[in-house]
């Protein structure tokens, strides 16, 4: 049974706070193991990758065999039925078009003192994409991570994916080819992150690493941050649905289960102002769990982390609760979703109206599905083009403009006790240190 809360009850505040404070991430401490793997790969390079691949993926491979050949990729693509290939192509097209609109513009102007000022954006040179392996790997995540990098102008995009016992979902390779991935390597885990960060004889290092992974991959990304950039440390998936009683309860039940089926640690929350509707949704979830293929996972998620919150008025009460949850996915299944969305500050992605299930955003809508979890939407955003770019500011002074602003720079340098700073300005104004 999910947690049931009523905003009007006397104990709501502490109960809601406990819901927010509930820890869903793995408590597994893997930092020492990961540190050893990173150090080993940094020291032994390809030999370490080969050893770990044999140990963890039960697969013997040579250094030359770490990289997928073009023929292997083409063979995998040929295995995919045309309708599925077309669906993947449509997703890639829509994702690309949306992210093209995220491209920033340069700034260039001359201010009132005659100083030229500006800002330009450039892409990182190389990015690495981690893809969880096996037959259950998600090609949609390949598109969502790779296409923004390509739109940004990343010159070299590298994908690493473990292949347990040599198995890989051919859709993953097809998505990589469609997205323009330049190199694909059959290596995973913390050792793959190490290879991307430090480089080996076979795998040249990258500048930024993105993509989801298990506790070992997450710990590895944390530890190599600073040597390379990373996107985020993703936690279990989550959805918050704000729905009125005019909805089909089965639709809302399926939306809640769309995240619950990801992981037993995922969280699905419903906020509604209709008690009878809440009851119908709960019954619909129970009915659907009887037939869902991933029922064991979804049932554990709904039982341990699910919640239904009853409020007096959705427009008045829901936004404050939403902002405290700061959900990864927010569905607004109400008559006027825009009015409600305008009052929400913290959410990774917002899905507007009764006909916009979160799952449409996972695959085909266009915006990225790599989103902040675990309340980090309070201060961070989903993956996008800017994650693969950096800005550089530009300053240009002539003799006259330096004369206009230089004296103040000299005074500030003197106040900070940095003599050479001030002299470097004063010398250009034919002045000494005063």
UniProtKB/Swiss-Prot annotation:
- Can you tell me which residues form the catalytic site? 328-329
Q: Name one GO biological process term.
A: L-histidine biosynthetic process
Catalyzed reactions? L-histidinol + 2 NAD(+) + H2O = L-histidine + 2 NADH + 3 H(+)
Among the entry's GO cellular component annotations, what is one? cytosol
Q: Where does Zn(2+) bind?
A: 259, 262, 362, 421
Write down the EC number.
1.1.1.23
Q: Which cysteines form disulfides?
A: none
Signal peptide positions on this chain: none
> Which UniProt key words apply to this protein?
Amino-acid biosynthesis, Histidine biosynthesis, Metal-binding, NAD, Oxidoreductase, Zinc
Cofactor binding mode, per the note? Binds 1 zinc ion per subunit.
Gene3D superfamilies per UniProt: 1.20.5.1300, Nitrogenase molybdenum iron protein domain
The enzyme's first-digit EC class, named in words, is oxidoreductase
Q: Which GO terms describe its molecular function?
A: histidinol dehydrogenase activity; NAD binding; zinc ion binding
Q: At which positions is substrate bound?
A: 237, 259, 262, 329, 362, 416, 421
Q: In which pathway does it act?
A: Amino-acid biosynthesis; L-histidine biosynthesis; L-histidine from 5-phospho-alpha-D-ribose 1-diphosphate: step 9/9
Q: Name one Pfam family in it.
A: Histidinol_dh
The cofactor named in the record is: Zn(2+)
Q: Which residues bind NAD(+)?
A: 130, 191, 214
What is stated as this protein's family in its record? Belongs to the histidinol dehydrogenase family.
Give the protein's biological function. Catalyzes the sequential NAD-dependent oxidations of L-histidinol to L-histidinaldehyde and then to L-histidine.
Q: Which PANTHER family match?
A: HISTIDINE BIOSYNTHESIS TRIFUNCTIONAL PROTEIN, HISTIDINOL DEHYDROGENASE HDH
Its protein name is Histidinol dehydrogenase
């Amino acid at each position: 049974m999910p947690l049931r809360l009523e905003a009007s009850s006397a104990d709501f505040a502490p109960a809601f706070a406990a819901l927010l404070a509930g820890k869903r991430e793995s408590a597994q401490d893997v930092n020492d193991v990961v540190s050893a793997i990173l150090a080993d790969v940094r020291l032994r390079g390809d030999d370490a990758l080969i050893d770990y691949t044999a140990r963890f993926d039960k697969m013997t491979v040579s250094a030359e065999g770490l990289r997928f050949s073009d023929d292997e990729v083409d063979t995998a693509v040929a295995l995919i039925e045309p309708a599925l290939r077309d669906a993947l192509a449509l997703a890639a097209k829509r994702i690309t078009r949306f992210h093209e609109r995220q491209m920033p513009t340069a700034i260039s102007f001359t201010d009132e003192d005659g100083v030229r000022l500006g800002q330009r954006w450039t892409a990182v040179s190389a990015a690495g994409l981690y893809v969880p392996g096996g037959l259950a790997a998600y090609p949609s995540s390949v598109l969502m991570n790779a296409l923004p990098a390509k739109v940004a102008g990343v010159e070299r995009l590298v994908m690493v994916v473990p292949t347990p016992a040599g198995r890989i979902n051919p859709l993953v390779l097809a998505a990589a080819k469609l997205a323009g991935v330049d190199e694909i390597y059959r290596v995973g885990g913390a050792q793959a992150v190490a290879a991307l960060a430090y480089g080996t004889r076979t795998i040249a290092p990258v500048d930024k690493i993105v993509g989801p992974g298990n506790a070992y991959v997450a710990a590895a990304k944390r530890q190599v941050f600073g040597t390379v950039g990373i996107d985020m440390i993703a936690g279990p998936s989550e959805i918050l649905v704000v729905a009125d009683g005019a909805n089909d309860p089965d639709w809302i039940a399926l939306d809640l289960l769309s995240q619950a089926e990801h992981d037993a640690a995922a969280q699905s929350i419903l906020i509604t102002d209709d008690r009878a509707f809440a009851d119908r949704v709960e019954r619909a979830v129970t009915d659907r769990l009887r037939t869902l293929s991933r029922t064991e996972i979804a049932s554990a998620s709904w039982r341990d982390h699910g919640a239904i919150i009853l409020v007096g008025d959705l427009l008045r009460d829901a936004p404050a609760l939403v902002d405290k949850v700061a959900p990864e996915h927010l569905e607004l299944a109400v008559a006027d979703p825009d009015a409600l969305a305008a009052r929400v500050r913290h959410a990774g992605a917002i899905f507007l109206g009764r006909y916009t299930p979160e799952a449409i955003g996972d695959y085909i809508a266009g915006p990225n599905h790599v989103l902040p979890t675990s309340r980090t939407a309070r201060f961070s955003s989903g993956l996008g083009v800017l994650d693969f770019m950096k800005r550089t500011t530009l300053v240009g002074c002539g003799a006259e403009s330096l004369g206009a602003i230089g004296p103040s720079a000299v005074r500030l340098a003197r106040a900070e006790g940095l003599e050479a700073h001030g002299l470097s300005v004063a010398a250009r104004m034919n002045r000494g240190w005063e």
